[in-house]
Amino acid sequence: MLRIAVPNKGSLSESASTMLREAGYTQRSDTKELVLLDEVNGVEFFYLRPRDIAVYVGEGTLDLGITGRDMLLDSHAEAVEVMPLGFGRSRFRFAAAAGSTLSLEQLDGLRLATSYPGLVDGYLADRGIKARLIELDGAVETAIRLGVADVIADVVETGTTLRQNGLELFGEPLLESEAVLIHRSEGTPPSGLEQFRRRLDGVLVARNYVMMDYDVERSALDAACALTPGLESPTVSPLAKPGWHAVRSMVPRKQAQNIMDHLWALGARAILVTDIAACRL
């Protein structure tokens, strides 16, 4: 029985559960549920605070977990990233009062408020910078206005909250974060990991690709296939109409409309695009 930790709340929770459902796993219907047994797939899900997930996995209490890359690195737990999951993307940035024109080198001796002391301390130590870290549990944006800190380091998605509090970003991002699948860094990988990983990878591919079908004359077939090479090769079948072929290929979702325009210009017709519900590659 595979034991997997899932965020119980926050920005990662709903997206994680949605991905797991798309991968064929049962998920809780009541947010008060803390444990759910999916007997069909042989998985037991535990809904935990996102910040605690890396600790449970690192200690070997649970086999796998879904959490943020920022929280994994901040925890210093004995856990490693298996694969990125494509949601919950954010950047970890430094910010100061608007107009302060600070640089990274000027952080020496300053008060720096953050909810991620482990992550920030490691980043600064690698660069020989010694700031006074002040750990806060959320609402870091108000620390400068309240006189608690000179600068902050926090997760930034749009930057709207920072601007509303009179702050501006400076320096390069400390980290590009997103939701990740993790397992313990020591010992043998848990049984069932590869199947679970393949299912999630199938969801990612299904989200990022579509299936494209079209008919094209033999004279334009090579050019059309160059536009739709697929993962290995497009599927090409002769039609009853002499000189015409049917083509099927996976194409990147974001490029589908542009590819359709080019195919039409080549003379392709009956161009259809359908979603991919699931796949294994």
Locations of the language-model features?
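Short, structured active-site "lid" loops
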Residues: 42-61
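Small-molecule-sensing regulatory modules
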Residues: 1-42, 47, 67-80, 85-91, ...
